Amino acid sequence: MELHHPELTYAAIVALAAVLCGGMMTRLKQPAVVGYILAGVVLGPSGFGLVSNRDAVATLAEFGVLMLLFVIGMKLDIIRFLEVWKTAIFTTVLQIAGSVGTALLLRHGLGWSLGLAVVLGCAVAVSSTAVVIKVLESSDELDTPVGRTTLGILIAQDMAVVPMMLVLESFETKALLPADMARVVLSVLFLVLLFWWLSKRRIDLPITARLSRDSDLATLSTLAWCFGTAAISGVLDLSPAYGAFLGGVVLGNSAQRDMLLKRAQPIGSVLLMVFFLSIGLLLDFKFIWKNLGTVLTLLAMVTLFKTALNVTALRLARQDWPSAFLAGVALAQIGEFSFLLAETGKAVKLISAQETKLVVAVTVLSLVLSPFWLFTMRRMHRVAAVHVHSFRDLVTRLYGDEARAFARTARRARVLVRRGSWRDDPNAGPGSGI
C-alpha cells in the first residue's frame, strides 16, 4: 500500500515506538532513555529499517543535546553545588586524567590509533546524568549526602564536556594552538566567574515576569533563549553546547526559574527522546557481532576500570568507604555526552567510522547494563560482610530473591498453560497433564 504522507507516517511510528519502548523500560524500573535507544535500534538499519536515513533526525538530535545541557543548567542549584564543589572538581579532574592517560598507555599494546585513544579516554571519563539520577531517585538516595556528591560530580563532568569538545576540535589543525588553548581557558574561567557572581544574588528578569502571564510566549521565550545563547556561543567560535549550558545556568538562577523550567521541559523531553533515538540508529549489530570479543572485552574493562577509578578518586577526596563505593559504582557507566564526543572526534577525523561504531556500541551497552551493575555491586558489598562457602552460595545470595520470584512466575505460567490445554482437549482431565 502506497503511503500518501510518508513523513507523517514515519513520525507516528517513531513516536509510538518511543512510547512503547520507554514505557517498557520504565515498567522494568530502568531509565526511559534506554528505551529510546532501543526504539532507535528497532527502527534503524539493525532492526526493521523503517528509519534508514539518520540525517533526517540529526538536526533535531542536535537540538536535543542543546536542550539537555540547557535544562541541566536550569536545574543546577549553584549554592548546593558549591557545598561539594571541591570533591566534584577534584574527582572529575582525576577521572579525566586517569581515563585519557590509561587509554594513551594502552593504545600501543591494543593497536589503537592516537585519535581513538584520546576520544575513548574522554568518552570513558563522562558518566550518564540521565541514568544515574533515575537510579538514585528510584532508591530515594538522590537527596542524601552521597546523592548530592554524585550529582555534583555529574554536573562537573557535564561542564567538562564543553572544554573537552574544544580540545578535540583543535586536533583538526594537528596541534593545540595558543588561540585554542586560550579559548578553552577563557571559557572555563568565564564559567567559574559566572558561578561566583550568581552565588551572591538571584536575578530578576523583567521580561520573563511579563511573559509568565502568557504560557505560550513563556515557552517560546525559553526556547529562544536556549538556542539564542547557543548561536551566540557558536558565532564566538565556542561550542553551541557551551552557550546553551550558560543560558540555562542564568535562567536557572532567576526568580522565574520554576515557571520557565516547567514550560521548557515538555519540548526538551521530546527533543531528548529524538537524541537518544538517533543514538539507537547508530548502533550496528552486524559490527557488534563481527567484533563481539573486542566489544565485550572493552565493555568489561571500562566498567571495572571506571568503578576502581571512581572509588579511588572519591577516597582520595576523603569520602568514607560506603559513600565512595556507592557513588563510584553509580558513576561506572559511559554517559550520553560520550556520543557527542565521538561525533566530534569523527568530524575532525580523529577516529574513523568503524572506530565511532566501536565507541557507540560500548557506550550503549554500558548505559543498558548500568542499573544491573549497580544492583549487583550493591548486593556484593552486603554479601562481603557474610562468610560465603561457595560460588553457588554467592550467586544465591546475590540473585536468590529474583530467581525465586522468576521460578514462582514460571510455575504459575505452566499451570495456566496446562489449564488452557485441558479446555482445548475435551479428553484431557485434571490429572492427565501432570
From Swiss-Prot:
It is a multi-pass membrane protein. Disulfide bonds: none annotated. One of its GO terms (cellular component) is membrane. Keywords: Antiport, Ion transport, Iron, Iron transport, Membrane, Transmembrane, Transmembrane helix, Transport. One of its GO terms (molecular function) is antiporter activity. InterPro entries: Cation/H_exchanger_TM (IPR006153), FeTrans_MagA (IPR054983), K/H_exchanger (IPR004771), Na+/solute_symporter_sf (IPR038770). The chain crosses the membrane at residues 6-26, 31-51, 56-76, 86-106, 113-133, 176-196, 269-289, 294-314, 321-341, 357-377. Its main location: membrane. It comes from the Bacteria. GO terms for biological process: iron ion transport; proton transmembrane transport. Gene3D superfamilies: 1.20.1530.20. Induction: Induced by low iron concentrations. Pfam families: Na_H_Exchanger. It is found in: Membrane. Iron transporter, which is required for the synthesis of bacterial magnetic particles (BMPs). Probably involved in the transport of iron from the environment into the cytoplasm across the cell membrane, and then from the cytoplasm into the BMP lipid vesicle across the BMP membrane. PANTHER family: SODIUM/HYDROGEN EXCHANGER FAMILY/TRKA DOMAIN PROTEIN, SODIUM_GLUTAMATE SYMPORTER. Belongs to the monovalent cation:proton antiporter 2 (CPA2) transporter (TC 2.A.37) family. This is Iron transporter MagA. It comes from Paramagnetospirillum magneticum (strain ATCC 700264 / AMB-1) (Magnetospirillum magneticum).
